Amino acid sequence: WFNIGGKSKIFYKADNLKELVNFLKKLDNKEKIFILGAGSNTLISDNFFDGVVIKLGKNFNNISLMGEDIIIAGSSVLDKSLSEFAMTNNLSGFEFLLGIPGTIGGGIRMNAGCFGREFRDILISIQAVDKVGNVITIPSKKIKFEYRKNDLSEDLIFLSASFKGNKSQANVINDEMLRLKKEKEKNQPTRIKTSGSTFKNPVSQTKKKVWELIKESVPLDQKFGDAYISEKHCNFFVNKGNATFDDMIKLIDFVAENVFKKT
């Protein structure tokens, strides 16, 4: 989303589970692997990545309803698509996903959330495959979730997940989604080259939001090359032209150092 990044040794798009498992079994176990979702929360180096980038294809992009209140979604399904599917099936609890521009797999990996809700609030279980091709199912109660993280192994590739909603009415759900959308558009930049919130809120250290700390500590007109701080939300950094990876890292480091100095 920053429109920044270099090349990798191998880029592999898996069309289905069988192909993915076969590919993993052929890889050297020491090979570095990076799973690319929507790329909406990713800053990629301009340097060559000496490893394998894997992206899951269309057969990991299915959504289905099981029973009255359980949804099964592939890991490359967009968060927005899951929220809309839930609304169509009169299930609430997924409205917050409308504000997250990522995939189900990425959302689980970082326990993504907004508007006071997180993935762990709706997750029942995940299906994943490890680096050597073993497919496993993990119940959410076996996962230790924290703010924007969990204890799942970095070696796992998420395939799909099951979620539980609450029966409601589509018009009520739609009204809530419209309210959240308006709130997001009012407070956050959209349709620009950004990767969303850069820093996590320091929930264990202060009640202040990270944007408040940045606003109090950093000259907001600071830039490096074409890497800028958003005028609309100072925890959003923007590529206004041809910013490089180094430009963005310099801006991130500059903001972090100034906040640490003054708090």
Describe these PLM feature segments:
Residues A86, I104, I108-A112, Q127-D130, ...:
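Short, well-ordered alpha-helical segments in soluble proteins
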Residues M87-I124, T194, K200:
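A gly/ser-rich beta-alpha-beta helix-loop segment of oxidoreductase catalytic cores
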